[in-house]
UniProtKB/Swiss-Prot annotation:
This is mRNA cap guanine-N(7) methyltransferase. One of its GO terms (biological process) is 7-methylguanosine mRNA capping. Residues 345-620 form the mRNA cap 0 methyltransferase domain. The keyword Lipoprotein does not apply. It comes from Cryptococcus neoformans var. neoformans serotype D (strain JEC21 / ATCC MYA-565). Belongs to the class I-like SAM-binding methyltransferase superfamily. mRNA cap 0 methyltransferase family. It is found in: Nucleus. Its EC number is 2.1.1.56. Coiled coil: none annotated. Residues 29-44 have a biased composition (Polar residues).
Length: 620
């Protein structure tokens, strides 16, 4: 039987081709036999190395004892006792081969062909996560006595993990919580629970004032800074930190109180003590059944109908000056045309733009949620919906024109679910204190979060007494941190237009097809009483108005603890807010711009709009 085929090595093949010697005879084989070494169940009679490896090419008869004891998969693993050996550059698996001790290992080739074996699980590598695996192989006798002997491998085990005993840091020695609760402790805990449970509390004793209303709760803690950017959204977030209750169970939501004196029973306490209310809405502390609640609401309706009165005129003894009477009669004579007919106004674009300006001021400076608003010069209630968007809790409107106040109250009654309580009074707020007309629960000092005067404050600068009374009414009822907002004619711009008139012009009139302004004198001594006649198409019919000296106004406000925080002309407000997230879309929603982005105002209306400016003061 012929011997099995000998592996072909690179060096031997080269020698056979270059010289014809003993190697040629040694490498000769029969072409009729082709047997694989794996088919013979016996060891080979001569040493062998893996064909194609670097070690086999350089040393064809080298022998590694580990080749017979380790499996081919783990043949590249070396023990901790072996010296490092060069790796094969042609083997993709990174296996290692032991060279004869008498031979010098060939250096590994450098360059792109140099192979760096990947990290495998070897006994010498402590970071390995796999244990060595042995495969039994037939034992062979080494052909060379100089071959190093293989030391049996002993698996290396890592040190056991360190065990940390549970020993937490204690403030005190551990003790048991299983201790008896004595009867006196139980009684004490029940007493505390009863005192803290609003469902078990008895109604608080009512303190009646001369008007029959209950004394209100103190005003909430004032804000120490201006509203933040998150508070400026004209459409506030739909959340509230108070318990949700049906509006009809919190306070009576019927027609507003529009006269001074005792309010209906539903307003027995104002401002309502929201913190003392229970989720059921029984804000007097009692817990009646469903029938009792229905009967209570019916009684409130009956009592309101008995006590309902029309909006009163000026209080007894209140004297109006001649010019104030002219202003009141003018606005009383203006009919309420409604939203539908208003669209046919020749200055509808200007009116919508002014409403947008007021929406910006309210959206930027309204206190949320559940703010309290004092509207001086409320007119016909044109801003009720704007304040509704701000989710206020209380609205008090005052105006010198009693017919306008009546129309404002009617507008509030027609509002579907206004969400706030409203009170309306006819009163000259620039000549008399508000305490002459407000009910006691509404004239608490520092009660209101916002005071607003839209297109009316300039009437107060007829003289120093009226201007100081106006500032006093604002400062007295505006809480610390509250904001006073308003819109007035730009006196500096009006004086510039007046000075542009030629000296020979004795009429002192300027304007356009939309408005006209006529001064009574070119030069005026003092900062009060510089009057002019103002006409605006379909709005103002030749009414006396007064310039507001801005520096004097800021000085008066500073004396009353009001600090200026905002001042911009109308065109500046438009340029600043037209692209804002909150107020830019309102230009289209409120009709200032049409679907094509075109303004409803013509050039004359735009000139009239730029005569005004907006402001905001914070009470310090």
């Amino acid at each position: 039987m012929l011997p099995p085929q000998q592996p072909i090595h690179a060096e031997l093949e080269h020698g056979r081709r270059t010289s014809a010697g003993s190697h040629a005879a040694q490498l000769a084989r029969s072409p009729s036999m082709s047997l694989s070494p794996r088919s013979q169940n016996q060891s080979l009679p001569y040493p062998s190395s893996r064909p194609g490896s670097a070690a086999g090419s350089a040393h064809p008869f080298g022998y590694d004892p580990r080749q017979g004891t380790l499996s081919p998969v783990l043949s590249a693993r070396r023990t901790s006792e072996d010296q490092p050996r060069p790796t094969s550059s042609s083997s993709a698996s990174g296996r290692r081969y032991t060279e004869p001790a008498s031979q010098t290992p060939a250096p590994a080739p450098l360059g792109s062909s140099a192979y760096r074996p990947r990290h495998t699980s070897t006994p010498g590598n402590p970071s390995s996560a796999y244990a060595p695996r042995f495969t039994p192989q037939p034992t062979t006798t080494p052909s060379s006595p100089s071959t190093s002997q293989h030391t049996p491998y002993t698996p290396h085990h890592s040190a056991p993990p360190r065990i940390l005993h549970y020993n937490p840091h204690r403030q005190s020695a551990p003790s048991s919580v299983l201790r008896p609760i004595y009867p006196d402790e139980v009684a004490h805990l029940r007493q505390l629970a009863h005192a803290n449970n609003p469902l078990r509390q008895k109604p608080a004793a009512r303190r009646y004032s001369y008007s029959g209303g209950r004394a209100p709760e103190p005003t909430p803690t004032p804000r120490t800074s201006l509203p933040g950017e998150n508070d400026h959204s004209y459409f506030p977030p739909q959340w509230d930190d108070r318990p949700s209750m049906p509006p009809s169970e919190v306070s009576y939501g019927g027609p507003p109180s529009s006269t001074p004196g005792a309010p209906p029973s539903g307003y027995s306490q104002y401002p309502p003590n929201w913190e003392a209310q229970t989720p059921g809405g029984n804000w007097d502390g009692e817990r009646p059944g469903r029938l009792g609640k229905r009967r209570a609401r019916d009684e409130e309706d009956d009592e309101y109908e008995r006590n309902k009165r029309v909006v009163s005129g000026p209080v007894a003894g209140q004297a109006y000056s001649k010019k104030v009477t002219v202003v009141a009669e003018h606005y009383n004579s203006r009919p309420e045309v409604g939203v539908e007919r208003r669209e046919f106004s020749p200055i509808i674009g200007l009116k919508k733009f002014n409403n947008w300006i007021k929406s910006v001021l309210i959206g930027k400076f309204a206190y949320r949620p559940r703010g309290k608003v004092l509207d001086v010069g409320c007119g016909k209630g044109g801003d009720l919906n704007k304040w509704k968007q701000a989710r206020i809790a209380l609205y008090v409107g005052l105006d010198v024109a009693d017919q306008s106040v009546q129309q404002a109250a009617d507008r509030y009654r027609r509002m579907p679910k206004p969400g706030f309580d409203a009170f309306f009074y006819a009163h000259d707020c620039f000549s008399n204190p508000l305490s002459d007309v407000l009910s006691p629960e509404l004239q608490i000092k520092d009660l209101y979060d916002n005071v607003t005067m839209q297109f009316c404050m300039h009437y107060a600068f007829e003289n120093a007494a009226k201007a100081r009374m106006m500032i006093e009414n604002v400062s007295r009822y505006l809480r610390r941190g509250g904001i006073f907002i308003g819109t007035i004619p730009n006196a500096e711009l009006l004086l510039e237009r007046l000075n542009e008139l030629p000296d020979r012009d004795e009429e002192l009139r300027f304007g356009n097809s939309c408005y006209s302004i006529q001064f009574t004198e070119r030069r005026h001594k003092g900062v009060y009483g510089h009057d002019y006649r103002f006409y605006l198409t379909d709005a103002v019919e030749d009414v006396p108005e007064y310039l507001v000296d801005w520096e004097n106004f800021v000085s008066l406000a500073s004396e009353s603890g009001l600090r200026l925080v905002y001042k911009k002309a109308f065109h500046e407000i438009l340029q600043e807010e037209k692209d804002s997230r909150d107020f830019g879309p309102l230009l289209g929603k409120m009709g200032v711009l049409n679907e094509y982005g075109e303004s409803a105002m013509d050039a004359d209306q735009w000139e009239a709009a730029n005569l005004y400016m907006g402001f905001a003061f914070e009470k310090m």
